[in-house]
Amino acid sequence: MDLRQFLLCLSLCTAFALSKPTEKKDRVHHEPQLSDKVHNDAQNFDYDHDAFLGAEEAKSFDQLTPEESKERLGKIVSKIDDDKDGFVTVDELKGWIKFAQKRWIHEDVERQWKGHDLNEDGLVSWEEYKNATYGYVLDDPDPDDGFNYKQMMVRDERRFKMADKDGDLIATKEEFTAFPHPDEYDYMKDIVVQETMEDIDKNADGFIDLEEYIGDMYSHDGNADEPEWVKTEREQFVEFRDKNRDGRMDKEETKDWILPSDYDHAEAEARHLVYESDQNKDGKLTKEEIVDKYDLFVGSQATDFGEALVRHDEF
């Protein structure tokens, strides 16, 4: 992979994703993804395993026997029981799931931090980020890959300034975390909406009309019939996205679309796990109830919890 391809992959712009003609592009910023598996307990519990431990931890489950799995699951249960009353509530389980899913964000930031804190002072300035990310590429006035790196840099600078709360163009680790992961921070959500509208609003009138909305997620392939999901999206735009029925989405309507706040996946999964494991139906789980359903939480194979336990000590 050459430098320009690498930069493209790492670009913090939300729009640069290519779609096949009949493949739907999803602009919605969901809660941190619990799993890319299908949630179908009738087939397997893969989704639940990913949600409970995080996808990366779940990958290493093949190594342990069921007995080892139960033993180490019991140790994790002790950590989930935040108030140490011997029970795991929906709220405690929800907090654990959110922690497990957000851990990858912090790991991603740690990886990026090492490459951008050039003077190793525990801060990342805009100049450091710019030099580390773009460097001499900006000296090429005519890149042959079709990407405008100067335009990408301007957009990155705007987002960096938004993440940098005190406006000194020097980011702490917390501020830097908001830079590549803006949808995790309420104060960054306006920039997410702005960038999305810039990507889709082809006529630059400050709104997203129906054709721009469809054109962003679907590229018509010659004489092929329009897929059914495209027709559904047209109906969604008219019936739900365009709330004031003026034929276009403004900033607030776009925000409601891409940053929905009416569904909490972590809470839904926590309630599901409690419902499936709560043998006496008292609305909370004992360690025994969880371990008895270890196949739901961690499967018949288990994970290398040694690393998980170390990582979760701070929880």
From Swiss-Prot:
Record-linked InterPro entries: EF-hand-dom_pair, EF_Hand_1_Ca_BS, EF_hand_dom
Protein residues bound to Ca(2+) 3: D164, D166, D168, E175
Modification Phosphoserine, positions: S69, S261, S277
Keywords per UniProt: Acetylation, Calcium, Endoplasmic reticulum, Glycoprotein, Golgi apparatus, Membrane, Metal-binding, Phosphoprotein, Repeat, Sarcoplasmic reticulum, Secreted, Signal
Residues annotated to bind Ca(2+) 5: D242, N244, D246, R248, E253
Phosphothreonine modified-residue sites: T65, T254
Record-stated family: Belongs to the CREC family.
The protein's role, per its UniProt record: Involved in regulation of vitamin K-dependent carboxylation of multiple N-terminal glutamate residues. Seems to inhibit gamma-carboxylase GGCX. Binds 7 calcium ions with a low affinity.
UniProt protein name: Calumenin
Lineage start: Eukaryota, Metazoa, Chordata, Craniata, Vertebrata
